[in-house]
């Protein structure tokens, strides 16, 4: 038959030591993905709010301030330099001679720093929104 060559004492500890690094990598990957996904949702909401303010008030400064206010959990905070506002007619939200209202597009780009460094040091995450001017 078969005989025991030695005690199996401590085998569970060895198996645990082999599995723990894999489980920790999986856990840290889930945490990093969750942070990145949350940041993208926050940026999309901030861009949507800025597009709404720009479409109604035709004020780029107020639109950028609205985007910053709509993303309070970003740390460090979203800056005005990370927010770009574009208009389909290139100038303002005012209607042109044919009474067609332009479309405003707001893009917010944010450099997210990873906590663990497993995926590099930073990644740029973007939120984008478009609305027709005219309220």
Residue ranges with predicted function:
Residues 1-71:
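Alpha-helical assembly-interface signal, strongest on the long, hydrophobic N-terminal helix that forms
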Residues 45-135:
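Short, conserved structural patches
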């Amino acid at each position: 038959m078969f005989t025991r060559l030695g005690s199996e004492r401590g085998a569970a500890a060895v198996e645990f030591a082999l599995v723990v690094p894999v489980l920790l990598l999986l856990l840290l990957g889930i945490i990093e993905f969750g942070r990145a996904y949350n940041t993208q949702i926050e940026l999309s909401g901030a861009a949507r709010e800025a597009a709404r303010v720009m479409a109604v008030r035709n004020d780029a400064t107020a639109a950028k301030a609205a985007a910053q206010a709509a993303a309070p959990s970003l740390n460090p905070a979203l800056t005005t330099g990370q927010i770009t506002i574009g208009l389909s007619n290139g100038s303002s939200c005012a209607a042109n001679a044919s009474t067609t209202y332009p479309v405003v597009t707001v893009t917010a780009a944010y450099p997210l720093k990873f906590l663990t460094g497993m995926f590099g040091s930073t990644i740029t995450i973007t939120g984008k929104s478009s609305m027709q001017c005219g309220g």
